[in-house]
Amino acid sequence: MSGADNLADMGAPLATGYRRFVTRRMVWLCALAAALCLATVVNVMTGPAGFSLGQVIDGLLHPDALEPGAYVILWEVRLPFALMAIVVGACLGLAGAEMQTVLNNPLASPQTLGVMYAATLGASLAIVFNLAAPLGLPETYVVPVFAFAGAIASAAVILLLSRVYGATVDTVILFGIALVFALQALIQLIQFVADSDSLQQIVFWTMGSLTRATWEKVAIVGAVFALCLPASIRQVWAMTALRGGEDYARSYGVAVDRLRLTVLLRVSAMTAVAVAFTGVIG
């Protein structure tokens, strides 16, 4: 038997095992997708004004035939809330998975960068100083805009420092922790000078809620996720190589620092847009 035949015989079990692994993953993905669809339908059906499955399907296919009250409940309340939960969960889930991969730490999350605390600081400033009027922004968007700006600003600081001092795991984590403590101190200072009404609004915002969801906000969060997902898929191989260690990834030609900075930028964008519209959630 030739050497090629020996290699083929040795590789056959590996190929079979890999196919089984991929099949199991696909089965799990299909099952989870079906569970998500079922949970969404049940969520839309459930509430003080309950809908049957037939009413939900008919309302989705023929919205003009619904009574005004039923139309508002289905299309303006329950569907935006349900879809916002899906797209925000997708953004935070993908962001968390990428953070854990590039930092090689199963405990890493978008909060590691201080993005959520920065968003809270931006929202607190908008609430306490009533920045909607002087800037001419719609009142429903002023808090999300400042929350997003704060989150992006904190991410920019982390990215700049990481680029200057090297985007190693220790560098990113230490800068993130330092930024978190600084932001927490500023948030507490804002809360100290806030009046009772503003303080109540800040507390409710930090608790997170889907009740602020609208179709426009769902579209914005969904668009950011749709832009980030293909970029994540393109870098799957490089991130998988990075799980074996930086030296291992570099031996395969992966630019580790550039990959880590790219992922951190993507994670920051997804986290910022999700937190801006729902508050500190997840």
Please tell me what each predicted stretch does:
Residues S2-G282:
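Alpha-helical transmembrane segments in inner-membrane proteins
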